[in-house]
Amino acid sequence: MPIEVFFREEEDIPELEFIALSLCDGKVLDVGAGAGVHALYLQEKGFEVDAMEISATACKIMEKRGVKNVIHADFFQFAEKKYDTLLFLMNGIGIAETVDGFRNLLKHSKSLLTDKGQLIFDSSDISYLYEEYRIARPDHYFGEINFQYEYKGNLGQPFKWLYIDQQTLIKIAHEENWVVQILFEDDNDQFLVRMEPRGDMSIEM
């Protein structure tokens, strides 16, 4: 992934992410905020937004770029505040690592949301990659991926990441008692999701 992606200007933000940002409401937690692209945008629009990162380096970069409220924490260990919107962009829910981890992410998200709170994120169906590149499907869920970044010849630590297809997402969300809206799909099998814990039926399926 080009480093420039993490330092985009407003005019470089893709349509899917603009739609997601336009749906933010109330107090926002930007999870996996990176270098603060989305947090800065929301901040400039007058939102109260906390930018969370597990990377201390990323937190320092955000502070230097002018993000006001930076939280250095592991999302799954964080329980200090409640929010109206939990935002996971650039496939931020990938931090779940596995399908079972996604269930845990949904459970923990409920504990961080206000009564009318919402979860907004994007993901991708990567099943086409196995056919296009003739890769044998793994024994585990095909969207559970191992990653390793490289920058100028330096390799980072390997890490696990999750891409989840719509059918699997909806099945798990319903089992975990969430209401789901698929709001947008692009030509690259990437899609935008808005979810609320079931009980508030203001979202129609």
For each predicted feature, which ranges?
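A short glycine-rich, Lys/Arg-flanked "PGG" loop and its adjoining helix->strand segment in the class I
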Residues: 103-115
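SAM-dependent methyltransferase
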Residues: 114-174
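Conserved SAM/SAH-binding beta-strand->alpha-helix loop
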Residues: 55-56
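A short SAM/SAH-binding and catalytic strip from SAM-dependent methyltransferases
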Residues: 83-103
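Conserved class I S-adenosyl-L-methionine
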Residues: 23-34
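S-adenosyl-L-methionine
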Residues: 1-23
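Core SAM-dependent methyltransferase catalytic element
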Residues: 176-205
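Conserved SAM-binding strand-loop segment of SAM-dependent methyltransferases
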Residues: 66-77
